[in-house]
Amino acid sequence: MEEKRKRIGIIATRNDPVLLYAVRELKRYLNASASLEAEEREEPTEERYDGYIELVIGHSLPNFSFGIEPGFDSGTGKPVLRLTGRDATGVLHAVYTFLEEMGIVFDISGPVVTKSFEYDKIWDLKEFVVPAVKWRGIRQHINFPMDISSYSLPDAREYICNLARLRMNCITFHSYPGQWYDLPSGELAGNFFYGQRYPIPRQLSPYIANENLFCIPEIERHDEDAPSKSQAAIQWLGAVMQEAKAVGLKVRFSVELRDHLDRAGLEICDRILALYPLIDELELITQECGTWAYPVLPARELEGLIAELFGPEVLEDGAIRRILAEACRETDEDTKAFINAGIWQLPGTLKELSNHIRLANELLASREERTVPELALGLYATDHSTLKIIRRILETHMPADVRCSLLPAHGARAVENSLKAMEVDRELMRNCMIYSWVEFDGNMYLQQNAVEGIGQLLKFLTTSQDNKQIYGINLNHWRTAENKTAAKYGSLTMIRGYIEPEEFYESYAQSLGIADTPRYASAMALLDETDDQVRNRLSNIGFCFADCWWNGRLGYFGAYEPQRITTIREEYKRVLELFQTCRIDTATANGSNDLELIANRIECTLIHLNMVEVMTQLQAVCGSLPPGTLSEAQKHDVISVCTRALGYCDEYMEHYCRILPDRGSEGTVISYYHTLPSVIHKIMELYVTGSIEESKPDSHADAPPSPAI
């Protein structure tokens, strides 16, 4: 005889949309259990319920806190579990804390039910959480095919819901020019992926949820009508923001004003705020690394630029002059010039920061005339000398009521190093959003793991803040399924505080039913270390934008050292062996699927490294020769090398397509098709035919800066 389902009454006020969402989520998962049945009730008065779960906002609780408290109802004598939070978002997070205790694993790729709910366990749960980080979330560049900017609206909404299920409470959307806002001057939105187009080739069409062009599926029909596409893009992002607000996320919007000064910059801000009234915080951020657009300046001229932009008083204590002196060396009798790899970042960063400070002050002063949300000044710079100088300028020039955001490095481990070098002070960090990485876009085509870097950042910030709550961390994120482990770790450590990676790996593997948890932990740790070596020794070897691979000659293929590729490849092989061993005794579907995906992606990584290594053979064939000067034998060698490399490209895409768990995986493979094979064909054409003009990449609406390697 089938056991009768236990009936639970859910009690909550109905005056808050986030609370209503919390009730729906709780009912959804309780009713999915074979042993439970849940209904909404106004108060615990009916005898037919076996117990009650009450959702309560506790205004006296610490900010951002949430908890679980068992008890009994005095009227009915029935057990009551109170899920409490400082606000409605906190209550929602208490709901997810409860559900995870009951046996659900929430991942960025979706929930996983790992065991049946036990009714009696409900009434023994007790927990109270003051998160280590106040504002916890994701930073979406919405700029590449593998992130949510290619998702259908239902898929994008579900992604947002999964962030809430990870108990995140913040999302930052970044828009490059021409992508997500239009302007009265006639510039349109809808130039997705920097304006680079991704027609779907026949070999990939069975795997892609578009007819002819890879983009948001609902917007594909607008492709030939630029104004219509622009409006559709804005409506799509507005709907995603609406979902974010419904699940309790703070919405931050980040924009680069570039050379739009004063009135032009204000018009952009006004337009964005008119298009997206749900924005809680507007961030004006400098371009990545100050861009290549500004000339390198000698130290004396740079001192003059600093004094011109921020006043001569910022130089008076000598600290900035000392930083400049340490960052430079003598290049002639009279001038110290910036010569290290990152020092060119400073002029552009200074000019844009100065402009943003003026605009922030003007926005604040005009609050009676316009609706102004919270404001932030963002800095995207990775050079340590630049960061040190900017930090000192912010100490005296940061407007009141304006927050700071820092994106200080490429890659999770490097963020902590940059903050240490920057010598951040406690006062600046008190209201500062730090951007780190779930994955680094420079290694997008490789399997990554950012757990160690995220953890070290938490540990550093906690220490530097004297163990007080950290203001905010948002993690850059593109691919979903491939990076769910790092995203899970990030979400947990931002709540609990620093967690030892090994402890996390073993617990996470156990929850998924992976058999050999110590071996899984070893595999993930080695993957993390190998990923960091790639970033340090093979910079941007997995970058996903064609123009950055090709400079009119061999591009990146002319820079990589084959021996380094060989060394890294051997490390990835070791990682793969560990994961394959884990698969042997893993019987659960959840664990097997997880291991199968990561093994596939490491195999793809090895194929990609093979391709790049083959292409480096051209260094000896034509690396020192101008196009159009090769002998017939050399041209034959170019064709042979490129043909072999293209074979590896086909193998990569074929293997990747064996497991496509989400839209981001589709985006990765279509991006690969239009990046590496395209560049290889251009190189082959250039050196075999000598046709330089025809081999130049297509122009785009915008492009990421080509990183130095």
Q: Can you say where each PLM-predicted feature lies in the sequence?
A:
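Conserved, mostly hydrophobic/aromatic
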Residues: 30, 87, 163, 284, ...
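Charged, glycine/proline-rich intrinsically disordered loops and linkers
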Residues: 184-224, 300-344
